[in-house]
Amino acid sequence: MNDIFGNNNGYRVPKLPFFYYIRNIMDIQLKQGCKYALLVPTSMGLRVTPESGQPIHSSDILHLQATSAETNVASISSYLGLPVKVLTTFVEGSPFAAFIKSNLRARGMDFEGADVPQGGPWGYRHQINVADSGYGSRGPRVWNDRAGEVGRTLNAKDFDLDRIFGKEGVQIVHLSGLIGALSPDTTKFCLDIARAAKKYGTRISFDLNYRASFWKGREQELHDAFSEICSIADILIGNEEDFQLCLGIEGPEAGGKDIASKINGFKDMIGRVKAQYPNAQVYATTLRQVNNTNSHNWGAIMLEGENWHVVELREIHVLDRIGGGDGFVGGLLYAILKGWEPEKWIQFGWASGALATTFLTDYAQPADEEQVWSIWAGNARVKR
């Protein structure tokens, strides 16, 4: 296994040993004596994709995957050997719950969560994400089917947060705005986790991940909750739409062309975020300009302390774009956990995001660090 210091002992899937160390990374001091490098709360679901990039309505062969944005992020660390834990909930006795648990084990992740009784055929279930990856001039389409989603019941009372953060220990907890906005219960769940993390010295990463349908009718409530999390977060991530619609912070027009010419506008936006939420040590956003479904220009901006780091937009070839942003966050967090210099945080994040778009799953499955760095270097030569 790869231990926390990156030594390879012949196995990919970690057995989650305790490790004892402390690192000062610029202003980010990671907690010592922790069992887990990374913790992610999430609502696990199913991703259904047609074969060969075909549209749903014309397909009769569908592939089933286990999915969530938060485990997409955590997969970079787990595949590269760091100990990861997932907090979630399952439908009791469901074959899909068994499928999800098997997938998390295969990714090298510990998981913990209640098995909730289904309550009959019209009761709880795991959410379904139907994804048409698109091709060429035909753009991707995603259909979310979340009726009866068991993850909406996530509640801090189902977990011993004092044990998880105090006795076991966690270096970084990654929170997503998807879970934060999923239901009133999950909003409180994320707040409780953030407060417990702060109490025990765990660093907090927060990706705003705005979804209009989740926010409808709850705008003020969610703005207040997200603002509290942002006020104690150590790492803040979001795109121009996230910062504007979640926090009311002005930024560049969402989407559009010629993103490269707007980099100063993105920097100004991040500066306003920092002024409003000065506790964080790292602020990051990705840049994406879509040429066609299979060709994107991909970049990133990061502010750590007073230092700007910019990855200028570069063309990447895309098999499936879903999960690229999660891959960026996962690579960024992995680089921070490894104690690398800040310049490498954004580089590894950019390359991990690019790697994720080459997989049919919506999460990257890096073979090793070298594979990720080869993407950064633009080297796609055969490795023998």
Where on the chain are the PLM-derived regions?
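Short catalytic helix/loop segments, enriched in acidic residues and glycine
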Residues: 55-75
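Histidine-anchored nucleotide/phosphate-binding helix
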Residues: 69-79, 190-196
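Conserved N-terminal subdomain of the carbohydrate kinase-like
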Residues: 83-177, 372-384
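Conserved phosphate/ATP/ADP-binding segment of small-molecule kinases
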Residues: 214-306
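Conserved post-catalytic alpha-helical subdomain immediately downstream of the catalytic base
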Residues: 293, 309-378, 382
